[in-house]
Amino acid sequence: MENIMTLPKIKQVRAWFTGGATAEKGAGGGDYHDQGANHWIDDHIATPMSKYREYEQSRQSFGINVLGTLIVEVEAENGQTGFAVSTAGEMGCFIVEKHLNRFIEGKCVSDIKLIHDQMLNATLYYSGSGGLVMNTISCVDLALWDLFGKVVGLPVYKLLGGAVRDEIQFYATGARPDLAKEMGFIGGKMPTHWGPHDGDAGIRKDAAMVADMREKCGEDFWLMLDCWMSQDVNYAIKLAHACAPYNLKWIEECLPPQQYEGYRELKHNAPAGMMVTSGEHHGTLQSFRTLSETGIDIMQPDVGWCGGLTTLVEIAAIAKSRGQLVVPHGSSVYSHHAVITFTNTPFSEFLMTSPDCSTMRPQFDPILLNEPVPVNGRIHKSVLDKPGFGVELNRDCNLNPPYSH
């Protein structure tokens, strides 16, 4: 009888945070909105708060960066560790150290689905449809996958069944699609700057931005718009048609997550050939099933917010069953290892985190070490051939441990 590898149990889970409202500002890391001054990501970008003029100019003005980065580390009995980062900060630390720890410690490192199910069910009474709690669960889940990969000596994508393509090709999200084209990306996604409170003038301004970028980038380069939940159905339909002459590939997250009927109406009335996409701020498997039923073209879960890799795999299966694509919201290595195994993810997102989008900067810089970035818009699967997610925690960052158990 062949020997079966004996897997260790989890000895301890630990949680730290960096950045956010109670630590240093501009820390970056898992909370990529927590950037310094003069950064494109905090420019005049349309949001649900833009209708209040005092919060229109800057997303940080209404507190988009107050949470900061959550870091979860799990340690096995043999001393090996796995970790992950997400957006949950100090409050996420409390949830891990005071509640979720009981479902993690003492389990085998391979008990990922069991731990995941127990975390979900134990937090139902205060998690609602996602948000902070789901971000925290996602971070734990990713840390568990990282640990499991390191214990067995395999990259996470091989634990999921292996790659279905040799490389991942990327589009870039940022303010300068023209620069993204020069860097080898297949497309560029820009934020909208105006919303329903700006009326038709806002539509004309955003359409003019698309027209300008189309002239700079040429006919074949993809252009997309990220609307970040800032619109209503009528405005979104008008904006989509205003941008149609400039061959806009898709219009993204026009409406808040709960407005499923609105997404169905938008898809029905969008210009022929223009895709409708959403999912970044949906936080449960059930919400993605309902979103899929609206008929949108691409679902865009964030693996650090939707329940982790365990849930992302299930979301991809839902999308595949309906002939839809799943293109995760930019999550660096945490999505790279997933999407290279998905047959319905032909490309992926890279979020530009340099202030003016002119240089390639790792998305979760500086909290991750050895975080890969695309070369000529691509990452080859061989880059991912390291145990776990293939990155290390930068312990020179100011890691704050606010709680213990």
UniProtKB/Swiss-Prot annotation:
Top enzyme category: lyase
InterPro entries: Enolase-like_C_sf, Enolase-like_N, Enolase_C-like, L-Rhamnon_dehydrat, Mandel_Rmase/mucon_lact_enz_CS, Mandelate_racemase_C, Mandelate_racemase_N_dom, RHMD-like
Chain sites annotated for binding substrate: 33, 59, 349
EC number: 4.2.1.90
This protein's UniProt keywords: Lyase, Magnesium, Metal-binding
Active-site residue numbers: 329
Residue numbers marked as site, Transition state stabilizer: 349
Pfam family membership, one: MR_MLE_N
Catalytic activities: L-rhamnonate = 2-dehydro-3-deoxy-L-rhamnonate + H2O
Family matches, as CDD domains: MR_like_2 (cd03327)
Annotated positions for site Increases basicity of active site His: 302
Cofactor: Mg(2+)
Manner of cofactor binding, per the entry note: Binds 1 Mg(2+) ion per subunit.
Gene Ontology molecular function, alphabetical: L-rhamnonate dehydratase activity; magnesium ion binding
GO terms under biological process: amino acid catabolic process; carbohydrate catabolic process
Binding site for Mg(2+): 226, 252, 280
Function: Catalyzes the dehydration of L-rhamnonate to 2-keto-3-deoxy-L-rhamnonate (KDR).
Family, per entry: Belongs to the mandelate racemase/muconate lactonizing enzyme family. RhamD subfamily.
PANTHER family named among the record's database cross-references: ENOLASE SUPERFAMILY, MANDELATE RACEMASE, MITOCHONDRIAL ENOLASE SUPERFAMILY MEMBER 1
Subunit structure: Homooctamer; tetramer of dimers.
Extra information: Reaction proceeds via a syn dehydration.
UniProt xrefs under NCBIfam families: PRK15440.1 (NF011968)
HAMAP family, A to Z: Rhamnon_dehydrat
Name this protein carries in UniProt: L-rhamnonate dehydratase
Source species: Escherichia coli O81 (strain ED1a)
Taxonomic placement: Bacteria, Pseudomonadati, Pseudomonadota, Gammaproteobacteria, Enterobacterales
